[in-house]
Amino acid sequence: MAARNIGIQVKAPEVECDDKNCPFHGNLPVRGQSFVGVVVSDKPHKTVIIKREVVKYIKKYERYERRTTKLAAHNPPCIHARVGDIVRVMECRPISKTKAFVVVEKLGRIDEVKGEE
């Protein structure tokens, strides 16, 4: 079965899977928000915990602060993201109580990015 077009410009995974909640090989539609984060945990089954940093301006102090947000995202077997991977996640329908996002692309490793500094 070929990977279907999910509506955004991402590279489809080479490996096929039989997960019904995969946006490429199943029938999970994606819509809404899309952002990049780092995988901090992959212990739950078919789930990864993503950490995302946001820089917010504090008007009173005329400074910026760094805020972090963690959220759970579905990890299809064809993408198979691991701890330390930089991934793109996209919003989808609620898959479980805490999961309403799905990993659509692996962008690299955090070690490779930090090694260039």
UniProtKB/Swiss-Prot annotation:
Q: What keywords are annotated for this sequence in UniProt?
A: Ribonucleoprotein, Ribosomal protein, RNA-binding, rRNA-binding
Q: Which domain of life is it from?
A: Archaea
Q: Which CDD domains match?
A: Ribosomal_uS17
Q: Name one GO cellular component term.
A: cytosolic small ribosomal subunit
Protein name per its UniProtKB record: Small ribosomal subunit protein uS17
Subunit structure, interactors included: Part of the 30S ribosomal subunit.
Cysteine disulfide partners in this protein: none
Q: Which GO terms describe its biological process?
A: translation
Summary of the function given for this chain in its UniProt record: One of the primary rRNA binding proteins, it binds specifically to the 5'-end of 16S ribosomal RNA.
Supply the Gene3D superfamilies for this chain: 2.40.50.1000
Report the sequence similarity comment from the record. Belongs to the universal ribosomal protein uS17 family.
- Database matches in SUPFAM superfamilies: Nucleic acid-binding proteins
Among the GO molecular function terms of this UniProt record, one is: structural constituent of ribosome
